[in-house]
Amino acid sequence: MDKAAKFESLYRQYYTPIYKFCFRFLNNREGAHDVSQETFIKFFERMNQQGNKIENNRAWLYKVAGNLCLNSLNKKTRHSEIENTIEIQSVENTNPENILIDNEKSKMVRNAIGQLKPKNRALILMYQDGLSYQEMAEATGIKQSSIGKTLWRAIDKISANIKL
């Protein structure tokens, strides 16, 4: 398979998960789109460099996307509210009161995740996306043996923030 076909295949496979990761990290559609595009531009450039083989494409993409999200957050002061784009996950749950409760719960969880340190936020989002501990370690630079403990601490902080 030539490089262009390989890139296209990986783009199709990973664009949506990377975009969703960036959106949840930044809470901004345009920013998520920009960071996702920049991630794949960097991936394409890396593919075309001589002797730069990427061992784990998925982990590499999440690492670059996470770093670009951090850079984006550092450039801007964030005082915007979370967009009201909550999907109703169950068609059966059409009771307006239940929908409102579900929306509030989702908002509280997103806000609690947003209050985490950026590396912990990235870990939680990667965990939600189903990355292995090894992939999370490669993407964040945290030792694989520390990923579980760091994740549980982040989950505890989320729980504590929700209970407040």
Residue ranges and their predicted role:
Residues 20, 34-41, 55-67:
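Structural recognition of an alpha-helix C-terminal capping motif at a helix-to-coil junction
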Residues 114, 118-119, 129-147:
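Helix-turn-helix DNA-binding module
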